Structure formats: C-alpha cells, structure tokens
Amino acid sequence: MKLCGFEAGLDKPFFLIAGPCVIESEQMALDTAGELKAITAELGIPFIYKSSFDKANRSSGKSFRGLGMEKGLEILATVKREIGVPVLTDIHEIDEIKPVAAVVDVLQTPAFLCRQTDFIRACAQSGKPVNIKKGQFLAPHDMKNVIDKARDAAREAGLPDDVFMACERGVSFGYNNLVSDMRSLAIMRETGAPVVFDATHSVQLPGGQGTSSGGQREFVPVLSRAAVATGVAGLFMETHPDPSKAMSDGPNAVPLSRMKELLAVLKELDTLVKRAGFLEDNFGWPACA
C-alpha cells in the first residue's frame, strides 16, 4: 500500500502514527510534531503526525473535548506546512468528512463506529487513506467485513480500494479493562489490509477513574515489542511532553522524552523479524483442521 509517499506493508519497515491525543495548542502541536519528525528521521521510520480536534466519546460530559474542527484543522494545516509531515485526525460524523479530508492526509475512524456502515462507506469515498480502528467489542476476523465494506464503497465511487488499514486497539476484558491478543494481528492480516497496532489505547482502562479513563503506560513497551515481534505494518502511539498534564488520555500516553529510546528498540526488532521474510504465511505452518 502506498501511504503518504512510502510503502506500507508486512514486508516493509513499520511506520509510526504518533502525537498528542487531542490538540491542546498550536505551539504544543508544532513542538511535538517537530520533535517526533527529528526522532523518526534519525531512526529511519516513516512518520505521520496524529492529533484530534474533538474527542467525541469522553467519559464525562464535563471533560475537555478539544478546540473544535475549525481551529483544529487550522492547526493541523500549520503543522503540515511548517513541519513538513503528513497529518492524520479522526472524524466522528459524516458531515465532518469533506472539510477534514480537504486538510489532512489520512482519516481515522473511531473504534466505536467500526460497525456503522454508512459512516465507513462515506469515509471510504473521501479519496483519502483511512485507518479503521477495530472496536473493543469486535472479533479480529470480523474486521474483514469492515474492510470489505470500505473497499466496495471505494470501488463504487471509482476510487482506489487499497487505501485502508486495520487497527487493533485492544479488546474489552470485563469492566474498565482491555487486553491485547497478539493472535489478532495475524488474523487481521486476512483482510488484506496493512495491520496497525495501537500501543497506547491498548493499555487504557476505559472509564477506570470514574469521570475519565485510566491507563497503564508502563505496559506500552511490553505490548509494542510483542506486536512488532508478531509482525505489523505500523504502530500507533499517543505521546505528550508531560502526560500528567495532558488534557486527554494522559495515563496511557508515552512521555515524549522516552519515545526515541522505545522506537530505537522497536526498529531493531522490526528489522530482525522481517528479515526472515516468513511473516506473511506464519512461517508456512499449516492451520489445524
């Protein structure tokens, strides 16, 4: 898959989607994007900057949602222009697709909306690549139906049908908890779409703090190493200069100061795993009858 000027796939080095959960200010967006660009350029990792203009599914109605679409898109356009990186943001309603697609390079669909057929189809007909997040309630093999919906819609509109990614972000495990089943990453390859692992939302504790979500960022390195060892096309990570002051998802955000050391390890592991060239067919091992 061609994505933002680079090739994405299981036989290619992993790419990174990263940035703060929500846009807090233009200056922080510029500073964070600049730092991430420098880190990924040094390590040779393709990079897409991510941040949200609206967090439409906050635990509490009183929580900070963002700066709004108009201001948020203005800031993302500034990041794209001044820092020189592709940008991604999520949309939540069909009406948002057209104005957002006019600014960003990649669209992202929220996990909760992966079964909303009209929404997925509309995103697919935007003409932009789309990172489709798997719902916390969805079996990994069910993502094939979601990707197929997107591809059908793109073809109907006369658009490329190979611009969709399938993103794993954990699965509900009882109340206020998520777990990551690494088999999901291999199963989701059956969609034919590049598979992305969301290493930070996978350690989220949804609603775990009553009026906000908790998180266990100490497990981000553990799960990201496991995902890269399993084999992925891309990684998604939210990061913040000071997670304790983040306005959304601070408990599961990676401190910006720790990103370089983590990515360096993941880069080495990715190179080692993909060197063998056996990931796509699981080393040729047959499935049990």
Swiss-Prot record:
GO terms for cellular component: cytoplasm. It comes from Cupriavidus necator (strain ATCC 17699 / DSM 428 / KCTC 22496 / NCIMB 10442 / H16 / Stanier 337). Signal peptide: none annotated. It catalyses: D-arabinose 5-phosphate + phosphoenolpyruvate + H2O = 3-deoxy-alpha-D-manno-2-octulosonate-8-phosphate + phosphate. The gene is kdsA. Pathway: Carbohydrate biosynthesis; 3-deoxy-D-manno-octulosonate biosynthesis; 3-deoxy-D-manno-octulosonate from D-ribulose 5-phosphate: step 2/3; Bacterial outer membrane biogenesis; lipopolysaccharide biosynthesis. The keyword Cytoplasm applies. Its EC number is 2.5.1.55. It is found in: Cytoplasm. GO terms for molecular function: 3-deoxy-8-phosphooctulonate synthase activity. Keywords: Cytoplasm, Lipopolysaccharide biosynthesis, Transferase. Belongs to the KdsA family. This is 2-dehydro-3-deoxyphosphooctonate aldolase. One of its GO terms (biological process) is keto-3-deoxy-D-manno-octulosonic acid biosynthetic process.
